[in-house]
C-alpha cells in the first residue's frame, strides 16, 4: 500500500473539495456548485497525481542509477515515459471516479441532465491532453535535476489558469489568453458543459478540435526534443552535457 499515492489521489482532492464547499457556504450559496467543487477537485487530483508521480519516477531512476541505463537502452526514453505517463493518467482516473461517486451518493447529484456522449468524448480528450503534457514535462526532468523544481511548481498555476474549480470567464483576459496553450483547458470546458447538461454546439466541436491539435503539438515537440537529446547524450557520453 502506497500512502503517497493515496494522499495525492484521494486525500488532496477531498481537501480541495471541502475548501471549495466551505467557501461556497461562506458566500451564502444555498448549495455548492458540484461541477466545480466536486468534479473539479477530481480533475485537480488527476493533474497533481500526474505531476508528482512523473517527477518521482525520474528522481527514483536517478537515485537508483537506472536513468543512464534507460537512456542508453535500445528502447527509447520516449517510449518508457509514454507508458509510465499513461499509467499515471489512468491511475488519476481514480480521483475523478471518487469525486463522481461522492457527487452522486453524498450530494445526490442528478444524472439525468448529464450529456453522457459529450462527457465521454471530453474526458477522452482530457486524458490525452494530460498524457501529452506529461511526456513533454518528463523530458525536462531527464535533462536537468533543477527542472524538477520547475515542474513541481506547475501544479497550482496550471490549475488556476485552466479553471479546474471555477469558470474561466472570471479570470482576467491576460490569464485566459495564457490558458489557451494548455489542451486540458479546452477539454475541461466541454466536460464541465456536459455535466451541466448542455447539448452539442459549434463551440463544443471547436473546443475538441483545439484540445486535440494542441495535444498533438505537445507530442510532436516531445518527440523532436527526445531525438535531439538522445543524439547529444550518445555523442558526449554525459547526461550533464545538456
Where are these regions (language model features)?
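Hydrophobic transmembrane alpha-helices and immediately adjacent juxtamembrane helices
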Residues: 1-242
